[in-house]
């Protein structure tokens, strides 16, 4: 394996995310705004499932195809602030998402977890959410691109179509 430390990372699809990072995140919380727009806009907003207290959404700036996020409808910034029922629903939706990802993409593994707080890597730090990132051998680390360009074999729209039906 060749040494890749201090190499350039090429992930052009994340540029829009990086540019938006300097904006005031509390200006508009996507995890509040998107569900509030109603289920008729779920395809446009990439919401693949709505539960009682949580929903599942595709990451608009994915690390890999099928990168899901599970978020509560309640606007809270930390896991301890959530009621036990909501935390349990988040875990059940993550498990369900992994089952659907398994059937759809057959990943070799997953990264599942929370980035709570900006210093921990949270892009939307004021609304707790869980990442479910399918992984394949050869994608190197949490970022699918390290030194060489990785081709995303599917558009977000194709990922939505492939995954949304599994939650029904």
Regions found by a protein language model. Name each.
Residues 1-168:
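HIT superfamily nucleotide-processing domains
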């Amino acid at each position: 394996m060749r040494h890749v430390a201090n190499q350039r990372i090429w992930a052009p699809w994340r540029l829009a995310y990086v540019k938006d990072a300097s904006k005031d995140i509390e200006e508009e919380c996507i995890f509040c705004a998107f569900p509030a727009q109603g289920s008729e806009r779920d395809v446009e907003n990439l919401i693949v499932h709505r539960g009682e207290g949580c929903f599942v959404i595709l990451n608009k700036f994915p690390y890999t195809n099928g990168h899901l996020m599970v978020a509560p409808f309640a606007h809270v910034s930390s896991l301890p602030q959530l009621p036990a029922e909501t935390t349990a629903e988040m875990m059940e939706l993550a498990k369900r998402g992994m089952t659907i990802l398994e059937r759809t993409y057959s990943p070799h593994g997953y990264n599942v977890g929370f980035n709570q707080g900006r210093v921990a890597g949270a892009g939307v730090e004021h609304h707790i959410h869980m990442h479910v990132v399918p992984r394949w051998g050869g994608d190197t680390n949490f970022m699918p691109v390290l030194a060489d360009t990785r081709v995303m074999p599917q558009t977000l729209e194709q990922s939505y179509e492939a995954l949304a039906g599994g939650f029904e």
